[in-house]
């Protein structure tokens, strides 16, 4: 381990991937020498940890035998992590596995993502999941549509899965699937009208067009106006005359 500290993490990873235990003497040496991981590039640490937490045989019990290794790798106290939830999510997308492990950190998950040099996309998704997992309004249809429009369908499907596994709440996942199955409007690009339609109504200012489109979208998301061209144009005319 002294010659190549990354072998410490590889040992953890192999244990998770292959489902075998490591003898006590070796485990003790891995934990004792974990400070050497500070000499390893963050990207390589992230790669090994990700393979471990996403592994088919991930075990919270076995993972917990390497508290020093994990703490020195991630840069947070092991007690602030949630390997039990990560075990429930094993085999899921990398973002779900990371979010499950880091969920107790809340907004602090962003610092771990930065420290381990996550890609921008992975960091954005992990932070989205950790920040919204316990949001009680997430299952609301309006909120689901709004979040799909802002963060994408894939991220919302992952959020639904995480809430089901972490909280035992399936309503978010069902709502997301229902919205997607019915091809409901979730963003400006889904609306039956666009800026050109508003220009034909005599609206010329770009800022005013943007404001009215946002208002139309919000009304559609709230089911106040159907996503139909005639209804939306009538709504826009009324907004202009106000």
Go through each PLM region and give its residues:
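Short clusters of hydrophobic/aromatic residues that line enzyme substrate/ligand-binding pockets
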Residues: 1, 147, 193
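Divalent metal-dependent catalytic cores for phosphoryl transfer on phosphate-bearing substrates
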Residues: 82-170
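Short coil/turn helix-boundary motifs
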Residues: 55-56, 137, 151, 205
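Charged, low-complexity, helix/coiled-coil-prone segments
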Residues: 5-9, 72, 140-144, 153-158, ...
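Glycine- and charge-enriched loop/helix tracts that form the active or gating conduit
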Residues: 1-116, 207-208, 212-220, 224-236, ...
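Residue-level signal for threonine
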Residues: 23-24, 119, 187, 194
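Generic structural marker for isolated residues within well-ordered, non-membrane alpha-helices
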Residues: 11, 109, 144, 194-195
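Charged substrate- and nucleic-acid-binding regions of tRNA-handling and nucleotidyl-transfer enzymes
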Residues: 13, 162-242
